[in-house]
């Protein structure tokens, strides 16, 4: 891989640092962060297994009987059925309400088998490390996450009140795997909107910052992490989401925004948002697999922050710095940013894989 770094200074535009990369390898592993504050790992971990129907409940019993689930750091894992978990949950501790979530689920595949822990190093590690043991569509949720995984070790604090979950899915066409993070991001924004509508609450305008950040009023409230492995002619994709629902730190949260608009309104619940997410995601995923991302583009572009964003790019060519202005038009078929220069030349912009902010590291190539 060959790389040349250059920087850009913008006046009334966004400040971007551009990294030009040349690589012929396809990108099947995409990641961004929702990490937690650093805490020492417990010597043991309790995982509660919960199913929507008798089918998933039998899966839970089988996993417990075989003691099948493991963690990558060799932490001792204790598997508990939902019916046995009463001693883990106190009425006043605001733990994730398993019954409330399961009652909200109306999907056919996603979210019907749930793993919950009051305190967990990483939900992503649970689903990715045990992918073959779990039904496709399984989700892992925790109340406190202290060793979250993120892009280039980025930190996303995960205190109580944050909705933190990871789930599994399978895909066969590796060319569209990088696009799944956009489907997930869109489903999160639509889920929040759906819950607000159902509860008669003011609409919280959650926006997507490409490729996988979620923003409200200019502040980050969430992020998406997608990883994949290839096995038996399928891509095993683990998807992680972190969303600030009821935690005012480290930035802001949905309920803080809601209180600012309507102080007396009912608050959003993590369980309701997660149930609405899987309802939206299952529909979007089926559309995406049947018709491609084109079927979701119009809605996605109404939700993201970048339409017609103008960017000044400085490229270093043979020791000479050349400036170009490009305007973001949308996404390419590969899921990267599509931009046009003032000379009408089309460009594809890629992240460099090194910066916390994707817009401080981009690839630019002519198309």
Swiss-Prot record:
Catalyses which reaction(s): apo-[3-methylcrotonoyl-CoA:carbon-dioxide ligase (ADP-forming)] + biotin + ATP = holo-[3-methylcrotonoyl-CoA:carbon-dioxide ligase (ADP-forming)] + AMP + diphosphate + H(+); biotin + L-lysyl-[protein] + ATP = N(6)-biotinyl-L-lysyl-[protein] + AMP + diphosphate + H(+)
Keywords: ATP-binding, Chloroplast, Cytoplasm, Ligase, Multifunctional enzyme, Nucleotide-binding, Plastid, Transit peptide
EC number, UniProt record: 6.3.4.-, 6.3.4.11, 6.3.4.15
Described purpose of this protein according to its UniProt entry: Plays a major role in biotin-dependent carboxylase biotinylation. Catalyzes the addition of biotin to the biotin carboxyl carrier protein (BCCP) subunit of acetyl-CoA carboxylase. Can also biotinylate methylcrotonyl-CoA carboxylase. Is responsible for most, if not all, biotin--protein ligase activity in Arabidopsis. Is essential for plant viability and required for ovule development.
GO annotation (BP), single: biotin carboxyl carrier protein biosynthetic process
Classification via PROSITE patterns: BPL_LPL_CATALYTIC
Name of the protein: Biotin--protein ligase 1, chloroplastic
Membership in a protein family: Belongs to the biotin--protein ligase family.
Residue ranges occupied by any BPL/LPL catalytic domain in the UniProt entry: 105-289
UniProt entry tagged with the keyword Ion transport: no
Gene3D superfamilies named in the record: Bira Bifunctional Protein, Domain 2
Cellular component GO terms held in the UniProt record: chloroplast; cytosol; plastid
Pfam families attached to this UniProt entry: BPL_C, BPL_LplA_LipB
NCBIfam families documented for this protein: birA_ligase
Transit peptide: 1-37
PANTHER family tied to this protein: BIOTIN PROTEIN LIGASE (PTHR12835), BIOTIN--PROTEIN LIGASE (PTHR12835:SF5)
One Gene Ontology molecular-function label: biotin--[biotin carboxyl-carrier protein] ligase activity
Taxonomic superkingdom: Eukaryota
Disruption phenotype: Embryonic lethality when homozygous due to aborted ovules that had not been fertilized.
Residues reported in the UniProt entry to bind biotin: 122-124, 145, 149-151, 220
Tissue: Expressed in roots, leaves, stems, flowers, siliques and seeds.
Other comment: The alternative splicing of the 5'UTR of HCS1 mRNA controls the dual targeting of HCS1 protein through alternative use of distinct initiation codons. A small ORF (uORF24) located in the HCS1 mRNA 5'UTR is essential for the AUG choice. The presence of uORF24 favors the synthesis of a short protein form initiated at the second AUG, which consequently localizes in the cytosol. In the absence of uORF24, the translation initiation begins at the first AUG, allowing the production of a HCS1 protein headed by a transit peptide.
Claim: Chloroplast is one of the keywords in the record: yes
